[in-house]
Amino acid sequence: LDETYVDGIILTASNTRKEQLRYNAYRDLFEFKVDGQARVLDPSTTIKKVNLGEETFVVEKYVTDKGIAKYGYFTLLDSGKANLFSKKSVKFTPGMKGRALDGGDQPAEYRRAPDEFYFKVNGSDLVEIRSVKSMIAAFPDKQEELSAFARKEKISPRNILK
């Protein structure tokens, strides 16, 4: 996300370290330098959280679009009985040779993709927020109450994430 390294704190199960860090959203890892050498911090269960400026990143298990379960870094937006997370991502677009009418080549580029939002209730699995209905379905004992509230307040997914 950022080319420059920023002061950050890595909290693991056994210790706390201050490092110059930056988050690589394309590869979903943190990069830091030790004696001028670049190192990486892959998401693993030993990492409790990483504070980078105003943001707190935590490691959570999730299922990718391809159905593969893996660990990744998520920005913690809100915590309590239910936790709200965002997943930052960057997409790579390969370069293309210009065609007759295009007028030139298209260079390869990395482009920031919209954040994906997730929630987790009482230690359950991470659930992606795709729509208000899917979020309400995750609370079977409060479904009617939440549906009525969403209708009354005219809640859209954008409102949930603000």
Regions found by a protein language model. Give the residues of each.
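Strongly charged, low-complexity linkers/loops
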Residues: L126-L146
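Aromatic-patch recognition
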Residues: G8, A13-V132
